[in-house]
């Protein structure tokens, strides 16, 4: 996608040296665009855990390049066996992280150490290219849903939660890809953007993305979604996800479950957009089996923004003697999901439908 007319991916190998890794620091958006240069797997791990990069597909791609940097420094078996668990420990909920690392480990184990650095960069690049193609396909399938809702309507109002746009993937995004394509196709779409406390990915990332693309949007507070649904001002909900079980349960940013409940109560279709790499075929019960990341209380008790004089300011918004809990994700049961938008099409959120859509993956896991 483009920033002020310049095309970007969210991660790439530096053109100057052809080995270091460049990312867009998402903690600085929307106020500044900073592109740090990462040269070690430790820097990659920090970028993931501190959320300089976030979004399930992107952290998988970033971790893949972390392995490549490690193999450039030391291609031994010991180094490979050390870097994979180190990177895997950075974020526990998103399955794409583990998927990408396991793919890298399998690919590199087939090469002698002397070939591993080149092979690692090639595999990481392939993961990135495949992500772009996958998200484009997700967008095309989701576009059909939006086009169908647009029949006989002046405008299609879509609510989204958190950020599942191009900055959360290598390009295009998952939940936002159909919206971009609908806008580009001339469909009158308008997006209600949840602020998404406590890290505010809605108003700091999704609103920024949509604005750069020219998509009409309105930022709303997290608790307003149900109100707009009751008033008939939401035609559909599209969100992303960090992990989907084989039975269709969905782990996504905290607050997603409440949106799904409100959508069900008001007859609003609730869709989840995802690449197949986000499906965890090893578990069925999302609530009982998906690990939920607990992040620092400071993300809840403080907030950062731009002061009127242009300076950046972090302030405490919670009384100093109050504690804060900060689960980063919740689980939406499959029964509340109208459909899963994948790169192969749209399917119901249940084990039979997922296995029919991805028989190769389901059989491979069963074996």
UniProtKB/Swiss-Prot annotation:
Instruction: Give site residues, Transition state stabilizer.
Output: 162
- Record's family? Belongs to the eIF-2B alpha/beta/delta subunits family. MtnA subfamily.
* Keyword hit for Isomerase: yes
Q: Which residues constitute the catalytic centre?
A: 242
For this entry, the protein name equals Methylthioribose-1-phosphate isomerase
Q: Does the keyword Transmembrane apply?
A: no
The record's top EC class is: isomerase
As for what it does, the entry says:
Catalyzes the interconversion of methylthioribose-1-phosphate (MTR-1-P) into methylthioribulose-1-phosphate (MTRu-1-P).
For the ligand (substrate), the binding residues are: 54-56, 91, 201, 252-253
| Entry keyword set | Amino-acid biosynthesis, Isomerase, Methionine biosynthesis
Q: Which organism is it from?
A: Acidiphilium cryptum (strain JF-5)
Pfam families assigned: IF-2B
**In its UniProt record, which GO terms are filed under biological process?**
L-methionine salvage from methylthioadenosine
Q: What InterPro entries does the record tag this protein with? A: IF-2B-related (IPR000649), IF-M1Pi (IPR005251), IF_2B-like_C (IPR042529), Initiation_fac_2B_a/b/d (IPR011559), M1Pi_N (IPR027363), NagB/RpiA_transferase-like (IPR037171)
User: What GO molecular functions are on record for this protein?
Assistant: S-methyl-5-thioribose-1-phosphate isomerase activity
Pathway participation: Amino-acid biosynthesis; L-methionine biosynthesis via salvage pathway; L-methionine from S-methyl-5-thio-alpha-D-ribose 1-phosphate: step 1/6
Q: List the catalysed reactions.
A: 5-(methylsulfanyl)-alpha-D-ribose 1-phosphate = 5-(methylsulfanyl)-D-ribulose 1-phosphate
> Any idea of its EC number?
5.3.1.23
């Amino acid at each position: 996608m483009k920033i002020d007319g310049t095309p970007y991916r969210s991660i790439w190998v530096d053109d100057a040296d052809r080995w270091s890794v460049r990312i867009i620091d998402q903690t600085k958006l929307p106020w500044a665009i900073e592109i740090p240069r990462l040269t070690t797997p430790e820097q990659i791990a920090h970028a993931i855990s501190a959320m300089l990069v976030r979004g399930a597909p992107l952290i998988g791609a970033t971790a893949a390049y972390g392995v490549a940097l490690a193999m450039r420094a030391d291609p031994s078996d010991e180094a490979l066996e050390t870097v994979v668990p180190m990177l895997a420990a950075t974020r526990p909920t998103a399955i794409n992280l583990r998927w990408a690392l396991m793919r890298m480990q399998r690919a590199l184990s087939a090469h002698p150490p002397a070939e591993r650095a080149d092979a690692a960069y090639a595999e990481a690049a392939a993961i990135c290219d495949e992500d772009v193609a996958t998200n484009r396909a997700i967008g095309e399938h989701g576009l059909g849903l939006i086009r169908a809702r647009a029949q006989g309507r002046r405008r299609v109002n879509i609510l989204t939660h958190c950020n599942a746009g191009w900055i959360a993937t290598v390009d295009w995004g998952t939940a936002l890809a159909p919206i971009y394509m609908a806008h580009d196709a001339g469909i009158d779409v308008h997006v209600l953007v949840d602020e998404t406390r406590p890290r505010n990915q809605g108003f700091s990332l999704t609103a920024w993305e949509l604005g750069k693309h020219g998509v009409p949007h309105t930022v709303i507070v997290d608790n307003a979604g149900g109100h707009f649904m009751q008033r008939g001002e939401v035609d559909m909900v599209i969100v992303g996800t960090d992990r989907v079980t084989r039975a269709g349960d969905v782990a996504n940013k905290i607050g997603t479950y409440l949106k799904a409940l409100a959508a069900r109560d008001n007859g609003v279709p609730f869709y989840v957009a995802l690449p197949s790499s986000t499906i965890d075929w090893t578990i069925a019960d999302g609530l009982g089996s998906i690990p939920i990341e607990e992040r620092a209380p400071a993300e809840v008790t403080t907030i950062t923004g731009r002061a009127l004089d242009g300076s950046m300011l972090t302030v405490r918004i919670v009384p100093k003697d109050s504690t804060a809990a900060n689960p980063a994700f919740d689980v939406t049961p499959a029964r509340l999901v109208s459909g899963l938008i994948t790169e192969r099409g749209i399917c119901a959120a249940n084990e039979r439908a997922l296995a029919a859509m991805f028989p190769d993956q389901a059989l491979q896991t069963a074996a």
